[in-house]
UniProtKB/Swiss-Prot annotation:
It catalyses: 2 H2O2 = O2 + 2 H2O. The lineage of its organism: Eukaryota, Fungi, Dikarya, Ascomycota, Pezizomycotina. Heme binds at residue 390. This is Catalase. One of its GO terms (biological process) is response to oxidative stress. Keywords: Heme, Hydrogen peroxide, Iron, Metal-binding, Oxidoreductase, Peroxidase, Peroxisome. Its main location: other. It is an enzyme of class 1 (oxidoreductase). Disulfide bonds: none annotated. It is found in: Peroxisome matrix. GO terms for cellular component: cytosol; peroxisomal matrix. It comes from Blumeria hordei.
Amino acid sequence: MRLSLWNLLGLSGLVVASCPYMSGEDQEYHISHIQARGTDSEFLDQFKVEDSNSYLTTDAGGPIQDDASLKAGERGPTLLEDFIFRQKIQHFDHERVPERAVHARGAGAYGTFTSYADWTNITAASFLNSKGKETPVFVRFSTVAGSRGSADTVRDVHGFATRFYTDEGNFDIVGNNIPVFFIQDAILFPDLVHAVKPSPDSEIPQAATGHDSAWDFFSQQPSTLHTLFWAMSGHGIPRSYRHMDGFGVHTMRLVTDDGKSKLVKWHWKTKQGKASLVWEEAQILAGKNPDFHRQDLWDDINAGNGPEWELGVQIVDEEDVQAFGFDLLDPTKFLPEELVPVTILGKMKLTDNPTNYFAETEQVMFQPGHIVRGVDFSDDPLLQGRIYSYLDTQLNRNGGPNFEQLPVNRPRTKVHNNNRDGAGQMFIHTNKAPYSPNSLSGGNPKQANQTKGRGFFTAPSRKVVGSLHRGTASSFADVWSQPRMFYNSLIPSEQQFLVNAIRFEISQLKSDLIKKNTLMQLNRVSNDLATRVAAVIGYKPLDPSPEFYTNATTDYVTIFGKPLPSVVGFTVGILASTSSSTSISQAAQLATSFSSRGIRAVIVGESLLSGTDQTYSSADATAFDAVVVTMGAETLFGPVAKPNTLFPSGRPSQILHDAYRWGKPVGAVSKASVVLEPLPGTKNQGGVYRVESVNELATSIAKGLETFRFVDRFPLDS
């Protein structure tokens, strides 16, 4: 049996202790800087166009009429001289820009980051230099593989990119909701993307990996297994963007003003708690509401319930880069928090939706190369490639080098450099000596460095040794132990979800060779997992391959094993009947009670009469985090229900049954509790509430939402 990660640490003499930076004590900061505005609204307002009380104009500003083209005669051909027609059509023809190759489907929001303390003891980054300092941010969440028109709830890694508009320039953390990545070297990125994208002949399937080319690559490139396991778990189908953590993925450096550096891993920890959909629900949502995640984020911010995350770092001494049994430069590995706790630096709250999706969310252009004084790179080979690739792809999407001048990309500080011209240049430069060094302009703009002008500087501790080498570092070789640790760390229901997800994917493969290769790789992680997958696709169990089997676990990867700290923003479906005044009255009382807790309530009835929000014909259990039935609505359920032309037969029962099957809290008031009887195994199960009063039901459902999903309803492999 291979030694566990913990045993390796014990043998190496490593001491696992709490982080020395956890105290968060303020320290005197000797350099004063203007604090970046928290709201950022004044900066953006200068770019907004308000059309109230105005006339149409050309792009050149002349008033026009553009609802009819200029023709030769009443019924004649359109004239070439019709500059209004040509301008309108030409601009329309060029409205679309190249779609992002990955992360095309996304949603964004503005907010504010607030530092909890003066962190100048670990970094010279100005946005962390004082307690309470606020910095405007823009965040873009996304899926990875699908096109811009794909659904939100597909199974995928999810992007979590954050821009800090600091008072010393823009700083981007271009991360994901999963702490690791598929590959160790950026040179393999085109291969990864080509493999998971739709087939080049049929353009099928969209935003999905259940096809031969994806699993051919996964099984031939086992570095993908760790990220794949995260994606096949609940992390691949989050309940919302609000309910997922974020990670910088790469090891970076924080550097102090005097040049002392530490290795760090960035973490965003959701204040809402982690929550996930279940797979059948996610699939139905992709058809019923492909905008589910972006709508959830938009609605919550509009309601004043903008989500929050805490930003933290794991801090490691430079010399400990390989002290944990793996190499911190390997982006397919994560550092368990039991080994190095996360030091929480501050909090981000999202408060404002974009004014224009294209101008802001589509045109925002993140780059790992957007770093500021006090932050530095590591030698992670994936990171090194991303620094180049992200800049290059922005040039392609924007058609020129001036994309940083777009409003959403502009820093909130003055820009002074010798970059000139290019398509879409928006500045009028007055410096006649755009080169360095110069004497004609007094040497301006001057060079900024570690001691002058608070310039960016590379950590003095960085050094490179060794011969040129094309290949993967030997310290990156073990790509099976950490996927096993992840699998070990899931509760049984989550393990079953992961097994079922892989079964779903593998059962769609056509190639027997790819199936066999996949089982071989799974078996190197877990014989239990490989055996359970093999049973579904008709293969015999494999003998254990124990070289990388470890009993190591971590407490920080499970989703369903912990109660949520907040239920604000969840939605409860209240099933009522417009033919019963008691039902509608109870529904209104429940809605008021839920609203007081920050929970959305949707009253569903046969028609949109006063007191209802949605009809049964359009309602579905996927839209609700819990479902309750009011007294009087029981007549719409089961054998007593009369045929109704206002909604599909059995729809009220279907909503309740689906909610129960997907582990959601369900309940009913008094006589309506009869509708719960047909649900399988509900007599003593948690999350099923039979109560006599409206207040009791509201309290019970709110408590049940803290559990979120009652996973004991899902069967386990025997």
